[in-house]
């Protein structure tokens, strides 16, 4: 059930159509979770600043049931910052990623929860 969200001030027209699918596949590989459970949400055209500058930036969140913590987060950060730089042209030093390890009982899907 990993959910990855990117809020960015990059305009929608500059977001490649392929990015959703590529993020899904790369997150599936990195987390070891099936692609069919991974959700990606890109929110472009946001009024944002980072360090007082409105140059391209991104504020991101990765939620997952497990697979969050320590070295895993460093691996995800490298992967995601590289992809954001490649596809959205946002420098890695203008990206924050917050990680959330969610209890399975607190995630609803398909009429129930994952617990």
Swiss-Prot record:
Molecular functions (GO terms): cytokine activity; dopachrome isomerase activity; MHC class II protein binding; phenylpyruvate tautomerase activity
Subunit details: Homotrimer.
EC number: 5.3.2.1, 5.3.3.12
Keyword list, A-Z: Cytokine, Cytoplasm, Immunity, Inflammatory response, Innate immunity, Isomerase, Secreted
Main location: secreted
Protein name: Macrophage migration inhibitory factor
Active site: 2 (proton acceptor)
Catalytic reaction(s) noted: 3-phenylpyruvate = enol-phenylpyruvate; L-dopachrome = 5,6-dihydroxyindole-2-carboxylate
GO cellular component, one term: cytoplasm
Organism: Gallus gallus (Chicken)
InterPro entries noted in UniProt: Macrophage_inhib_fac, Macrophage_inhib_fac_CS, Tautomerase/MIF_sf
Family stated for the protein in its record: Belongs to the MIF family.
Class in the EC hierarchy, top level: isomerase
Gene3D superfamilies on file: Macrophage Migration Inhibitory Factor
One GO term of the biological process aspect: inflammatory response
Locations listed in the record: Secreted; Cytoplasm
Residues holding substrate: 33, 65, 98
SUPFAM superfamilies tied to this protein: Tautomerase/MIF (SSF55331)
Functional description taken from the UniProt entry: Pro-inflammatory cytokine. Involved in the innate immune response to bacterial pathogens. The expression of MIF at sites of inflammation suggests a role as mediator in regulating the function of macrophages in host defense. Counteracts the anti-inflammatory activity of glucocorticoids. Has phenylpyruvate tautomerase and dopachrome tautomerase activity (in vitro), but the physiological substrate is not known. It is not clear whether the tautomerase activity has any physiological relevance, and whether it is important for cytokine activity.
PANTHER family xref list: D-DOPACHROME DECARBOXYLASE, MACROPHAGE MIGRATION INHIBITORY FACTOR
């Amino acid at each position: 059930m990993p959910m990855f969200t990117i809020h960015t001030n990059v305009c929608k027209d500059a977001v490649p159509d392929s990015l959703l699918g590529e993020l899904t596949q790369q997150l599936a590989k990195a987390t070891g979770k099936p692609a069919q459970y991974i959700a990606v949400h890109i929110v472009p055209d946001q009024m944002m600043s980072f360090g007082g500058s409105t140059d391209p930036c991104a504020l991101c969140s990765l939620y997952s049931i497990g697979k969050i913590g320590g070295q895993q987060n460093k691996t995800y950060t490298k992967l995601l910052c590289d992809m954001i730089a490649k596809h959205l042209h946002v420098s890695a030093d203008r990206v924050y990623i917050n990680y959330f390890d969610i209890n399975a009982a607190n995630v609803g899907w398909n009429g129930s929860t994952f617990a």
